[in-house]
């Protein structure tokens, strides 16, 4: 069966693994998921990610990040633009997650960017997810 929304699947796997205090989470690889993982690593929400060969296709493995007393680095994840209802934001009206404490991930003509990066470049796009 084909997957309708691979980004939502990635975020759900990440949310579930984070809630269960797993150290790693594995999912099918795609370039879009790898770019989302790049943003999560750059913003400090995950420790690292790697691409692995599997028997069929490739796998993306995310290493989750926890504090010294196993505090979660990700408090919440929400998918915003869905296949049934796309959500777009102009460069003048970019979302701010929790007053700037979280990150909005946008798909723009310049690739995947955070809300802060998109504001600096002056581009808008599809709002994929919020992470805080």
Swiss-Prot record:
Q: Fetch the Pfam families from UniProt.
A: Ribosomal_S8
Q: Sorted alphabetically, which keywords does the UniProt record give?
A: Ribonucleoprotein, Ribosomal protein, RNA-binding, rRNA-binding
Q: Does the keyword Ribosomal protein apply?
A: yes
- What is the disulfide pattern of this chain? none
Q: Does the keyword Cytoplasm apply?
A: no
GO biological process terms, alphabetically, are: translation
Report the sequence similarity comment from the record. Belongs to the universal ribosomal protein uS8 family.
What biological function has been recorded for the protein in this entry? One of the primary rRNA binding proteins, it binds directly to 16S rRNA central domain where it helps coordinate assembly of the platform of the 30S subunit.
Q: What is this protein called?
A: Small ribosomal subunit protein uS8
* Species, as recorded: Arthrobacter sp. (strain FB24)
Q: Which gene encodes it?
A: rpsH
């Amino acid at each position: 069966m084909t997957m309708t929304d691979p980004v939502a699947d990635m975020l759900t796997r990440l949310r579930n693994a984070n809630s269960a205090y797993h150290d790693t989470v594995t999912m099918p690889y795609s370039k879009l998921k790898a770019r989302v993982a790049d943003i999560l690593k750059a913003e400090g929400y995950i420790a690292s990610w790697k691409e692995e060969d599997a028997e069929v296709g490739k796998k993306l493995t995310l290493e989750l990040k926890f504090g010294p007393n196993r505090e979660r680095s990700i408090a919440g994840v929400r998918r915003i633009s869905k296949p049934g209802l796309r959500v777009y934001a102009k460069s003048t009206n970019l979302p701010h997650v929790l007053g700037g404490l979280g990150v909005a991930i946008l798909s723009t003509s310049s690739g995947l960017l955070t809300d802060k990066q998109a504001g600096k470049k002056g581009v808008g796009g599809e709002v994929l997810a919020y992470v805080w």
